[in-house]
Swiss-Prot record:
The gene is fimA. Gene3D superfamilies: Glycoprotein, Type 4 Pilin (3.30.700.10). InterPro entries: Bac_GSPG_pilin, N_methyl_site, Pilin, Pilin-like, T4P/T2SS_Core. Keywords: Fimbrium, Membrane, Methylation, Transmembrane, Transmembrane helix. Major component of the type IV fimbriae that plays an essential role in twitching motility, natural transformation, and protease secretion. It is found in: Fimbrium; Membrane. This is Type IV major fimbrial protein FimA.
Amino acid sequence: MKSLQKGFTLIELMIVVAIIGILAAIAIPQYQNYIARSQVSRVMSETGQMRTAIETCLLDGKKADECFIGWTKSNLLGASGSPSSSNDSTADHPGQGGLVIDYKLEADATNAITATFGQNAAATLHGKALKWTRDPKATWSCSTDVELKFRPTGCKDDLK
């Protein structure tokens, strides 16, 4: 009686391993790009939410230390140390490096929220910044110095 062989031959297994290797070589860089894009979008959204609180503070004539901005610490920020500013007013966020909120109470002042990516962000984002700027006409715009392929739709301007 003949015995039937079961299983795969060595050649078949080597072909499967080669196919998996090729797919992984394509998928891993694409996934890393996806992670970087999602982190930039997340920081844009997190910092963008503070615009309403800042507008309210400006309209009420409050200084930064009198305002509740509603910031929750982010693990993606932190490259530049503690928040600081040379302007009239800076919101203080204890323990959150890489976040600076500068605003003045004058009607024609330019105000900004600047977030700097820290070590927990994707390697291509370390030390890069995303900035919301409010012009004297009360219009907010987003700019960043991250690579163009990682920028969200609403933040295509180069950081000035």
